[in-house]
Amino acid sequence: MAENNENISKNVDVRPKTSRSRSADRKDGYVWSGKKLSWSKKSESYSDAETVNGIEKTEVSLRNQERKHSCSSIELDLDHSCGHRFLGRSLKQKLQDAVGQCFPIKNCSSRHSSGLPSKRKIHISELMLDKCPFPPRSDLAFRWHFIKRHTAPINSKSDEWVSTDLSQAELKDGQLKRRNMEESINCFSHTNVQPCVITTDNALCREGPITGSVMNLVSNNSIEDSDMDSDDEILTLCTSSRKRNKPKWELDDEILQLETPPKYHTQIDYVHCLVPDLLQINNNPCYWGVMDKYAAEALLEGKPEGTFLLRDSAQEDYLFSVSFRRYSRSLHARIEQWNHNFSFDAHDPCVFHSPDITGLLEHYKDPSACMFFEPLLSTPLIRTFPFSLQHICRTVICNCTTYDGIDALPIPSSMKLYLKEYHYKSKVRVLRIDAPEQQC
């Protein structure tokens, strides 16, 4: 009997997990430390679990019935209110229609469809019109006005494409360009070319240049052979096969010859003059003779502001330069000559200029007369060595003669060149000789 009772108790617990209640699962999953329950207690717990499961099943079935009843009532109400209009629609569409009756929903499809950009392209014939062919405030109208605003008008009568003042040189260049273009176009015998004629207010330039080298080439045969509409206009650019086969450097030479202005031969006459106060410069203690700027900077290093020295310029186009101390550093300025006057800037008439160099140095000794960008020559740096006797003799001879008078002296030619070293040349006359015109 004991064995049978044990088998019965084992058979009671062996059942699928789906039929067990939550309390049974908890009991099976929880480790109990106490004694095992008796058969009567197990049977009571099993009966309680069955009753609980039955109650839960009935509640779930009632809820499902209520949901089905509510959905069916909504469908019936919709069918009753709207008639047969909703037949064949899905539940989602019916719910959207039902909600839309209480809360009106905008139709998004029409709004988005109108906001989408149009795929239609604006034709070139429509751009040629003076007025916009599209409805106002449309996307195509906006694009039409945008293109017309940012492109130049293709109209020969517009003032922007007309040149009012044309010189003879421009007329000749235009004739040459036009002839070259006609020669390049003659190779196409099947094409009728119509060059654009540009008129001015004064006269009709039939043989004149085309402003900007622009030509509208219209091919009549290509329009007839094409399958495009009659409103379409074709702009073709005809290029010559002869020029296409030419090397690049030959084309560049031709373009350079067309673009370069006519050349003129100029003849400039100079007069050579000796430095007027070479003897006074030689006797000035601030004159150091031949010296470069690096040696001058080494001498002026650490000297007070306004210290200066006069030296020969290292450049052949200039005779003298001054090195001075200002703004805590050593600076240099060339003495320029223009029209027998000496200054630190010969191209600026406002800058002080003097007929001799000693007068120029005397002017810049006063700090009040010196601008912030001009050299300050207040304290001369005394020379520490004497000049050679040969150099002193040259200064004395140059003080007594002129540049052309040196050639009359009975001295060797090498000595004449030595005496002419300190001289400058001044421009006297500029003669322009026109080149002979090339007949086209």
Swiss-Prot record:
Q: Where is the composition biased (Basic and acidic residues)?
A: 12-29
For this protein, the record's PROSITE patterns field holds: SH2, SOCS
Task: Please name the GO terms of the biological process aspect recorded for this protein, alphabetically.
Answer: intracellular signal transduction; negative regulation of epidermal growth factor-activated receptor activity; phosphatidylinositol phosphate biosynthetic process; positive regulation of proteasomal ubiquitin-dependent protein catabolic process; protein ubiquitination
Question: Its pathway?
Answer: Protein modification; protein ubiquitination
Task: Give the top-rank taxon of the lineage listed in the UniProt record for this protein.
Answer: Eukaryota
Region (Disordered): which ranges?
A: 1-29
SOCS box domain location: 376-425
Q: Which UniProt keywords apply?
A: Growth regulation, SH2 domain, Signal transduction inhibitor, Ubl conjugation pathway
Q: Which residues form the SH2 domain?
A: 286-381
Task: Enumerate the Gene3D superfamilies for this protein.
Answer: SH2 domain
All disulfide bonds of the chain are none
| Transmembrane is among the record's keywords | no
- Return the CDD domains for the record: SH2_SOCS4, SOCS_SOCS4
- Is DNA-binding there in the keyword field? no
A single GO molecular-function term is: 1-phosphatidylinositol-3-kinase regulator activity
For this protein, the record's SUPFAM superfamilies field holds: SH2 domain (SSF55550), SOCS box-like (SSF158235)
Which Gene Ontology cellular component terms are annotated? phosphatidylinositol 3-kinase complex
Q: What is known of its domains?
A: The SOCS box domain mediates the interaction with the Elongin BC complex, an adapter module in different E3 ubiquitin ligase complexes.
PANTHER family according to UniProt: PHOSPHATIDYLINOSITOL 3-KINASE REGULATORY SUBUNIT, SUPPRESSOR OF CYTOKINE SIGNALING 4
Function comment: SOCS family proteins form part of a classical negative feedback system that regulates cytokine signal transduction. Substrate-recognition component of a SCF-like ECS (Elongin BC-CUL2/5-SOCS-box protein) E3 ubiquitin-protein ligase complex which mediates the ubiquitination and subsequent proteasomal degradation of target proteins. Inhibits EGF signaling by mediating the degradation of the Tyr-phosphorylated EGF receptor/EGFR.
Q: What is this protein called?
A: Suppressor of cytokine signaling 4
Organism whose genome encodes this protein: Pongo abelii
